[in-house]
UniProtKB/Swiss-Prot annotation:
Protein's gene: Angptl8
UniProt protein name: Angiopoietin-like protein 8
Any Gene Ontology CC annotation: extracellular region
Lineage: Eukaryota, Metazoa, Chordata, Craniata, Vertebrata
Modification note: Proteolytically cleaved at the N-terminus.
Inducers of expression: Highly up-regulated following high-fat diet treatment. Down-regulated upon fasting. Strongly induced in the cold environment (4 Degrees Celsius for 4 hours).
Biological function: Hormone that acts as a blood lipid regulator by regulating serum triglyceride levels. May be involved in the metabolic transition between fasting and refeeding: required to direct fatty acids to adipose tissue for storage in the fed state. According to a report, may act by promoting ANGPTL3 cleavage. According to another study, not required for cleavage of ANGPTL3.
InterPro entries (UniProt xref): ANGPTL8
Tissue: Expressed in liver and fat. Enriched in white and brown adipose tissues.
PANTHER family associated with the record: ANGIOPOIETIN-LIKE PROTEIN 8
Disruption phenotype: Reduced levels of serum triglyceride. Mice gain weight more slowly than wild-type littermates due to a reduction in adipose tissue accretion. Plasma levels of triglycerides are similar to wild-type animals in the fasted state but decreased after refeeding. The lower triglyceride levels are associated with a reduction in very low density lipoprotein secretion and an increase in lipoprotein lipase (LPL) activity. Glucose and insulin tolerance are not affected and no alterations in glucose homeostasis are observed in mice fed either a chow or high fat diet.
Molecular function terms, GO-annotated: hormone activity
Keywords from the named record: Hormone, Lipid metabolism, Secreted, Signal
Location(s) in or outside the cell: Secreted
Length: 198
């Protein structure tokens, strides 16, 4: 900036040509006064340009600082977005695994229900047999028939207990499946909400 001011002063000085020597008592002092004013104006212009240069330099420095802050903020946001995407992917993977477990549990519950149906049918057949034996024993209370009756009755009681236990097991599995389905619905809702644009 100082070089620019010196160049400007040199240009102004070379532009002002010395006037021919005037006789004594001529306008020579006025020319020196004009030259002084020109130099003073050039100096003020140089100072003003120097001020503008410094202000512009300060603004550029501030803009560079702001740009650096903006870049860091963008980098931070990018990291946050990547972490959110990773968490969402992990959640989806967990959801898929839970869905597989729920399907397996559903298949086991269906198999248990089928077994329970078979046990119920077998118990009904056993009850029918017990009823027939009771009818037979009404007429004559025979020792061997009585023993067979007691054996069948014990088997019927045992199967009733087994049926009761299996029924409780199936009901417990159904409750667990209902809880897991509710939990899966909540996770799917959170995933759907997280996928919506902000």
């Amino acid at each position: 900036m100082a070089v620019l001011a010196l160049c400007l002063l040199w240009t102004l000085a070379s532009a002002v040509r010395p006037a021919p020597v005037a006789p004594l008592g001529g306008p020579e002092p006025a020319q020196y006064e004009e030259l002084t004013l020109l130099f003073h104006g050039a100096l003020q212009l140089g100072q003003a340009l120097n001020g503008v240069y410094r202000a512009t330099e300060a603004r550029l420095t501030e803009a560079g600082h702001s740009l650096g802050l903006y870049d860091r903020a963008l980098e931070f946001l990018g990291t946050e977005v990547r972490q959110g995407q990773d968490a969402t992917q992990e959640l989806r993977t967990s959801l898929s695994e839970i869905q597989v477990e729920e399907d397996a549990l559903h298949l086991r519950a269906e198999a248990t229900a089928r077994s329970l149906g078979e046990v119920a049918r077998a118990q009904q057949a056993l009850r029918d047999t017990v009823r027939r034996l009771q009818v037979q024993l009404r007429g004559a209370w025979l020792g061997q028939a009585h023993q067979e009756f007691e054996t069948l009755k014990a088997r019927a009681d045992k199967q009733s207990h087994l049926l009761w236990a299996l029924t409780g097991h199936v009901q417990r599995q159904q409750r667990e499946m209902a809880e897991q389905q509710q939990w899966l619905r909540q996770i799917q809702q959170r995933l759907h909400t997280a996928a919506l644009p902000a």
